[in-house]
Amino acid sequence: MIVTRARRLGDASGQSVDIVLRDGLIEAIVPAGSAFTEGHEVVDVDDRVVMPGLWDEHVHFSLWAQHRRQVNLHHADSAAQAARIMADAVEANASSENPDPVVIGAGYRDGLWKDAKTTQVLDALTGDTPVVLISVDVHSCWANTAALDRFGVVGHRDDGVITEREWFALSQQLSDVDATTIDGWVLDAAHHAASRGVVGIVDLEMTLSAPDWIRRVASYGARYPLTVECGVYPEDLETAIAQGLRSGLELAPGVTVGPFKIITDGSLNTRTAQCVEPYLGVEGEHYGALNWPTEDIEAMLVAADKAGFWLAVHAIGDKANQTVLDIFEKNDLHGRIEHAQLVRAEDFERFARLGVAASVQPDHAIDDRDVTDVYWADRAERAFALRSLVEHGAQVVLGSDAPVSPLDPWITIASAVTRTREGRAPWHLEQGLTISEALSFSTRSTLEVGQPADLIALDADPLWLVDALGSDLAKASDALRELPVALTVAAGAITHRHNV
């Protein structure tokens, strides 16, 4: 394949080039019109800006595919409103041709709600239909009595709120959809991701998803739209080791085993992220907590590393981040900390010194700005501190944590650079990234000979957009979030094209 009349992102000369792709690699880059085209598919991008394809370094892909079909609770500003939204959904479901046995809503953010979540509130409006509402951070749910009964949940009869490891177990039952259905939803989500310039994902689905991806690629019959690294969780570590799995092992074309993932603490919205200092605005001294004893976390990380797995460790609170960094340092481990939302001032330099990457989700800062200003108001300058990580030399990679935030790298990039959306004033702009940094942290390759044939063509130049609109960050944020992608090529195969 030859991508002709391409303007490389950041090329000051502005000269168009032909990019020759062969066997999944960039074979040559020559002046536009000079490539030998006979026998090649030629794609004319008409002087559009071309850059490397984008990666989302942290997704839960099946959950995201399902989330796209669930009741949207993002705008619910109270428990009562969320219950009313679900009541409407129950009514619509009952009148449908094939009603779902469980009605699921997703995306509520209750950190600042004034009223309490109770089964009584939900039961009064949803009746005998099992209803489950999933929080925006996917660390808890709120269920009515019918749902508690259906899934055999013990306790929680007053509030219907289930959190952390108990919720993670329940979520697997909710995600138990037949293979044909879920594979169709996943493929739809993959095509949509490709339309936003995504060429690869790190899939941290909370089950052993390797067999699922092998099946999907085999049934697709062509190069799947995404390159996938699929993770492994503690519950499946022994099985994965027994099966000979290790990070980097190819399972199918474009599918490899990804990292070992462990969730060490909770989240900010549920006030379960483990902190050095107590949460503000919470009765008593509440610090959050680890999901596992420290010695168990250490033992699992050492065992996974010994078995050949890369390490990806969820840590949100500053105490959890300190603990994980201590474990890495003590055992000479390397890997990534996922989220790193709150970090002690003295721990920023440890990321670079210990060779620990920060896998961060910039849109969470925009989602959680108001909650942060309540519960972490006395430490907000250390929250979602991307600039501090970069200035201390940390390797930073960007992702969405979909379904927590949408799987769209342009939303991620916009949040990283502008620290705002919906016209609000930027939040702690001093912790933002430059547009060049955000783009670099969203890619794994460059437009050079010998690099992977992963590239995208854009209908606008993101560097120019930010330069032109930089004085109005709200407009710059909107422009980046909506930036059109004309062409996506992953491993030398076209996975999306529009008007080219």
Q: Where on the chain are the PLM-derived regions?
A:
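Divalent metal-binding segments
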Residues: 2-5, 12-243, 269-303, 307-320, ...
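Short aromatic-centered micro-motifs
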Residues: 20, 262, 488
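Structural motif
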Residues: 22, 45, 448, 490-491
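Short amphipathic alpha-helices and their capping/turn segments at secondary-structure boundaries
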Residues: 46, 146-156, 238-259, 343-355
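Conserved, mostly hydrophobic/aromatic
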Residues: 47, 144, 197, 257, ...
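Non-cysteine beta-strand/loop elements that form the S-adenosyl-L-methionine
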Residues: 60, 254-272, 356-365
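His/Asp/Glu-enriched, well-ordered alpha-helical/loop segment
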Residues: 184, 301-312, 316-335, 339-340, ...
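P-loop/Walker A phosphate-binding loop and immediately adjacent motor/lid segment at beta-alpha junctions
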Residues: 469-500
